[in-house]
Curated annotation (Swiss-Prot):
InterPro entries: Ribosomal_bL28 (IPR026569), Ribosomal_bL28/bL31-like_sf (IPR034704), Ribosomal_bL28_bact-type (IPR001383), Ribosomal_bL28_sf (IPR037147). One of its GO terms (molecular function) is structural constituent of ribosome. This is Large ribosomal subunit protein bL28. It comes from the Bacteria. Keywords: Ribonucleoprotein, Ribosomal protein. One of its GO terms (cellular component) is cytosolic large ribosomal subunit. Belongs to the bacterial ribosomal protein bL28 family. Residues 1-20 are annotated as: Disordered. The lineage of its organism: Bacteria, Pseudomonadati, Pseudomonadota, Gammaproteobacteria, Pseudomonadales. The gene is rpmB. One of its GO terms (biological process) is translation. The keyword Ribonucleoprotein applies.
Amino acid sequence: MSRVCQVTGKGPVTGNNISHANNKTRRRFLPNLQHHRFWVEGEKRFVRLRVSAKGMRIIDKRGIEVVLAELRRDGKI
């Protein structure tokens, strides 16, 4: 399973760990992904999504039914 938010499309990015001695080693910054069940009132069922914290805030703001309609329109779910 890929580490990508189903709502925002956020995925891992790369960067450096930097030590006190300023040594740099490559690392990955992973998105804050959570598996979350959302109740869809129009369908009378739960939908399970893998979303980032930002994705959850988007769903809180716009509503799960609007976000699901966009995901289905774009073929993401």
